[in-house]
Amino acid sequence: MNAPLGGIWLWLPLLLTWLTPEVNSSWWYMRATGGSSRVMCDNVPGLVSSQRQLCHRHPDVMRAISQGVAEWTAECQYQFRQHRWNCNTLDRDHSLFGRVLLRSSRESAFVYAISSAGVVFAITRACSQGEVKSCSCDPKKMGSAKDSKGIFDWGGCSDNIDYGIKFARAFVDAKERKGKDARALMNLHNNRAGRKAVKRFLKQECKCHGVSGSCTLRTCWLAMADFRKTGDYLWRKYNGAIQVVMNQDGTGFTVANERFKKPTKNDLVYFENSPDYCIRDREAGSLGTAGRVCNLTSRGMDSCEVMCCGRGYDTSHVTRMTKCGCKFHWCCAVRCQDCLEALDVHTCKAPKNADWTTPT
């Protein structure tokens, strides 16, 4: 009996992953719906009851989240710009990314983390700009305080990131909290990692007051860093993401390979290896790399060898208008000429198999 039971436990993590329902964050589709909050709340498919309640109760927050979707998707596309999968979105798909994120891959881990971070960033910024009725600047940052440079007064408007994190947790995590499967736990972990990433780059900014800028008095406030810092940080976490399996009681993770460290709350986790994204694959949700621009001189992921998966590339000769002969004129302008520049553009060849054009 021991051998069969041991075999069952060995396969259990894989079974939990395979039996995972098709989890996706339908709130991502808020970017496409737009319009009034009522229209948005009623027409975004797949929202759970608590999400719809928050949506109707806080229309101003929903507007911020909706506007933020474009921001974090753009950041995702920036980070993946030189990779085979480039975080492409599908406007007519309510999951925004299609089937590609149904796989519990490291790409899914990154998207859930960056989207959760994007919600925190968008809500917190809207609070500071006075666009949300239920929050404002951080009320805890008042009076005097002390740092390594001495005593200062809290002033200005400190970003109320705790409100942003609290609302993001309630709204973004709602759907995953209803599930007890492996994918839901993975999403919750990566959502939290994304929220923590934004707070990691909260920085103190100060203004000096005194004769000739002597800084006799200082007024300080806390401000979020540019979202690019969060994106760069999560990109590093993506490259160091840890593959995990469910533990035997189904309540948490353990590393898939004992040589790797146990993931912290800041790490991204994933279950399944990624496809190679070389060819268009309906089931995997991959658009392939045919027609993608590649870099002939690079040795990285954007090189023609890697990007084109060994299929080769086509070269076209193009001309483009560019600025040239720029000169500085006192004071204070830079004047340039318009010049035509000839260059070679290299694009990946399509697979020889004609089935690659099958639409996803």
Curated annotation (Swiss-Prot):
Q: Pfam families, from UniProt?
A: wnt (PF00110)
The UniProt keywords, alphabetically, are: Developmental protein, Disulfide bond, Extracellular matrix, Glycoprotein, Lipoprotein, Secreted, Signal, Wnt signaling pathway
Protein name in UniProt: Protein Wnt-2
State the organism of origin: Nomascus leucogenys
Coiled-coil positions are none
Localization (cell): Secreted, Extracellular space, Extracellular matrix; Secreted
GO terms, biological process: atrial cardiac muscle tissue morphogenesis; canonical Wnt signaling pathway; cardiac epithelial to mesenchymal transition; cardiac muscle cell proliferation; cell fate commitment; cell proliferation in midbrain; cell-cell signaling; cellular response to transforming growth factor beta stimulus
The entry sums up its family as follows: Belongs to the Wnt family.
SMART domains to which the protein is assigned, alphabetical: WNT1
Glycosylation sites (chain numbering) = N295
This entry's Gene Ontology molecular function terms read: cytokine activity; frizzled binding
Signal peptide residues on this chain, from the entry's feature table: 1-25
Q: Name one GO cellular component term.
A: extracellular space
What is the disulfide pattern of this chain?
A: C76-C87, C127-C135, C137-C157, C206-C220, C208-C215, C278-C309, C294-C304, C308-C348, C324-C339, C326-C336, C331-C332
Lipidation, O-palmitoleoyl serine type: S212
Reported modifications of this chain: Palmitoleoylation is required for efficient binding to frizzled receptors. Depalmitoleoylation leads to Wnt signaling pathway inhibition.
What does this chain do? Ligand for members of the frizzled family of seven transmembrane receptors. Functions in the canonical Wnt signaling pathway that results in activation of transcription factors of the TCF/LEF family. Functions as a upstream regulator of FGF10 expression. Plays an important role in embryonic lung development. May contribute to embryonic brain development by regulating the proliferation of dopaminergic precursors and neurons.
Question: Keyword Cytoplasm, does the record have it?
Answer: no
